[in-house]
UniProtKB/Swiss-Prot annotation:
One of its GO terms (biological process) is positive regulation of DNA-directed DNA polymerase activity. Subunit of the RFC complex, an heteropentameric complex consisting of a large subunit RFC1 and four small subunits RFC2, RFC3, RFC4 and RFC5; the RFC complex interacts with PCNA. Forms an heterotetrameric complex with RFC2, RFC3 and RFC4; this complex has ATPase activity but is not stimulated by PCNA. The heterotetramer of subunits RFC2, RFC3, RFC4 and RFC5 interacts with RAD17. The gene is RFC5. This is Replication factor C subunit 5. SUPFAM superfamilies: P-loop containing nucleoside triphosphate hydrolases, post-AAA+ oligomerization domain-like.
C-alpha cells in the first residue's frame, strides 16, 4: 500500500517537471551550472564565501542569466526549508508604485529572523520599471535595513535606475551570450528532449536569439512542438521572421521593379507569411551594411530607414511606411545610375 502511495506521489511530480517550459526546466540551479560571465560569478562566489555579500545591481539584455545568477546564490545561501522566510522575490513591473516599497518590501526587510543568523535577501526583478518615487523610497529602505537585509536589483536599462540607488549597489553588467557558449547548452537540451534538429536550424536559433538564451529555448520548444523538426525554414516560419530568400525577393522588387509592382508584391508576401515591416527593415539594414554602396547612397538609405523605424515605433500606419521604404530604395537606384 505504502509503495503504491509513493508511486502516486512521484507521478504528479514527474508530470509537473515534464510539463514545465524548457526555460524553467533547464534553468541553472547552482553558480557552476551557469555558462557565461565567469568573472562576475567568481566575484559573487567570493562575496558569499567571505559572508560579505553587498547590495547587488545586475543589468544587461534579457536572457543573459541575471535572475538565474541571484536565484542560484539564494539557493547556496539558504536551505530549502528556510528559503521562503529568508528570500522575497518580486517583479517590479507588476506593481511599479511606492505602495510595493511601503508594503511587502518594508514589512519583510524590517522583521528580523529569530532562528537564523545572517541577512534576508530581497530580489527585485525588472527594477527599471519602478517609478521615480518608488526608487527614492527604496533608497531609504536600503539605508535603514542594511544590517539584516540585502537587496538585489535586476534590470535591462541601467539609465532608468536613479543614481542614488546605483551608488548603493555593486554593479555587474551581463552582456549577450556568445554562440560558442549557447550552442553546447542548446545541444544538451536537444539531446535531453530528443529534438530532431538540422545544422542550419541550430544556426537560425542562435542568429534569431541574438545572445538571449531564454528566447533561444522558447523558439526551440515552440518550433519543435509546431513542426516536429527544427530547420532554418521552420524556425523562421514559427517566429514570423522573414527568410533570407524573402529578403532577397523584396530587395529585387524594390531595386528592379516599378513602385506599384514592388508595393503589390511585398504586400502580398507580407500577408501570405504574416511578416512585420519592422523585421523586414532589420534584415534590409544588415544588407545595406554588407553591400558596397557609394557613401552618399548608403547615408541616404540609412537616414530614411532610421526615420521609418522611428515612425513605426510610435504607431504610424505600416502601409505608408512600406511606401516610404520602397520610395527610398527607388531614389537610391536613381542615385546609383546617376553616379555610374
Amino acid at each position: 500500500m505504502e509503495t503504491s502511495a509513493l508511486k502516486q506521489q512521484e507521478q504528479p511530480a514527474a508530470t509537473k517537471i515534464r510539463n514545465l517550459p524548457w526555460v524553467e526546466k533547464y534553468r541553472p540551479q547552482t553558480l557552476n551550472d551557469l555558462i557565461s560571465h565567469q568573472d562576475i560569478l567568481s566575484t559573487i562566489q567570493k562575496f558569499i564565501n567571505e559572508d560579505r555579500l553587498p547590495h547587488l545591481l545586475l543589468y544587461g539584455p534579457p536572457g543573459t542569466g541575471k535572475t538565474s545568477t541571484i536565484l542560484a546564490c539564494a539557493k547556496q545561501l539558504y536551505k530549502d526549508k528556510e528559503f521562503g522566510s529568508m528570500v522575497l522575490e518580486l517583479n517590479a513591473s507588476d506593481d511599479r508604485g511606492i505602495d510595493i516599497i511601503r508594503g511587502p518590501i518594508l514589512s519583510f526587510a524590517s522583521t528580523r529572523t529569530i532562528f537564523k543568523k545572517g541577512f534576508k535577501l530581497v530580489i527585485l526583478d525588472e527594477a527599471d520599471a519602478m517609478t521615480q518615487d518608488a526608487q527614492n523610497a527604496l533608497r531609504r529602505v536600503i539605508e535603514k535595513f542594511t544590517e539584516n537585509t540585502r537587496f538585489c536589483l535586476i534590470c535591462n536599462y541601467l539609465s532608468k535606475i536613479i543614481p542614488a540607488l546605483q551608488s548603493r549597489c555593486t554593479r555587474f553588467r551581463f552582456g549577450p551570450l556568445t554562440p560558442e557558449l549557447m550552442v553546447p547548452r542548446l545541444e544538451h537540451v536537444v539531446e535531453e528532449e530528443k529534438v530532431d534538429i538540422s545544422e542550419d536550424g541550430m544556426k537560425a536559433l542562435v542568429t534569431l536569439s541574438s545572445g538571449d538564451m531564454r528566447r533561444a529555448l522558447n523558439i526551440l520548444q515552440s518550433t519543435n512542438m509546431a513542426f516536429g523538426k527544427v530547420t532554418e525554414e521552420t524556425v523562421y516560419t514559427c517566429t514570423g521572421h522573414p527568410l533570407k530568400s524573402d529578403i532577397a525577393n523584396i530587395l529585387d522588387w524594390m531595386l528592379n521593379q516599378d513602385f506599384t509592382t514592388a508595393y503589390r508584391n511585398i504586400t502580398e508576401l507580407k500577408t501570405l507569411k504574416g511578416l512585420a515591416l519592422h523585421d523586414i527593415l532589420t534584415e534590409i539594414h544588415l544588407f545595406v551594411h554588407r553591400v558596397d554602396f557609394p557613401s552618399s547612397v548608403r547615408i541616404h538609405l540609412l537616414t530614411k530607414m532610421a526615420d521609418i523605424e522611428y515612425r513605426l515605433s510610435v504607431g504610424t500606419n505600416e502601409k505608408i511606411q512600406l511606401s516610404s521604404l520602397i520610395a527610398a530604395f527607388q531614389v537610391t537606384r536613381d542615385l546609383i545610375v546617376a553616379e555610374a
